[in-house]
């Protein structure tokens, strides 16, 4: 399976960064730095996929090219 597109953006309200995977509903994570947010969302992705497999739910294919985009402040 190809990898998923990841967005990383700063959150002034949370004083850190949020990363999300648009293809996996509600799969997002927070980190104090972009690198921490990326590591956290990769852990969240693994948990999301494991839960979907365990519950025999469909796993959506990636709709976007695998990339990591970061919005700057």
Model-predicted segments: where are they?
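Flexible, active-site-adjacent loop/turn segments at secondary-structure boundaries
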Residues: 22, 28, 57
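A short, exposed loop/beta-hairpin motif centered on an aromatic-Gly-Thr core
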Residues: 25-36
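Generic structural detector for well-ordered beta-strands
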Residues: 7-9, 30, 70
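Short, charged, surface-exposed hinge/linker loops at domain edges
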Residues: 1-5, 35, 39-73
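Short aromatic-glycine-(Arg/Gly/Cys) micro-motifs in beta-strand/loop hairpins
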Residues: 9-24
